[in-house]
């Protein structure tokens, strides 16, 4: 057992901690075998291996524990326009050693600073393009939805992120920001005009459509997907070879988080008609390298 303040011990792999929390899961499943068990563990160093132990626990029985996958900084670096620390390839569950898709990835949570707040405070710029501009920043949040929610597996959305909520987590009732105000009441979107702001409602609509596509198309149930990120031009390829070629069985997701226009090659795996799932237009691809 670790002593108070011994972070080295706490952050190391601890088999007693693994077994205690396995016991909690066993107890819950004894009452409801179909229930989900989700841990907010956020392990690092050796304790990250504990997450693998839990994710794969009783996996042959169709169980296993889900783990929160905090990618707040990685995603916020993208939305702010900074390539450093913007890689989120590790959100592929097998990178963490998980047998099944038990990683609950998220960009925002109750413990993290609001992405839009940081976009507007610290966003990058190039010429007339400025991430600190509200309309511009909200457009970038749409792209965030595309590269977060389409990744196969469960995801978490923190309240009002879908409206580009931009009050700091440390917002005080006197309109200042202070660490001591973290749990203070925050402005409610419906009372400050968010729901009638067309730019914010547009983020909501785009995210809703992406999530709807995720829920209603079996291609996203696959384990066969790749994530390539870290240069502000992330690409996700999703393939479900169990589906018919007449079904939606291949998806390519690309985004541009730089501050300038980019010529990004989608690298379609084959030629023919491809469909834009957002605007429902058709693109005839004749060159897989273009």
Where are these regions (language model features)?
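Active-site-proximal helices and loops of the catalytic beta/alpha 8
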Residues: 2-112, 120-132, 136-138, 143-155, ...
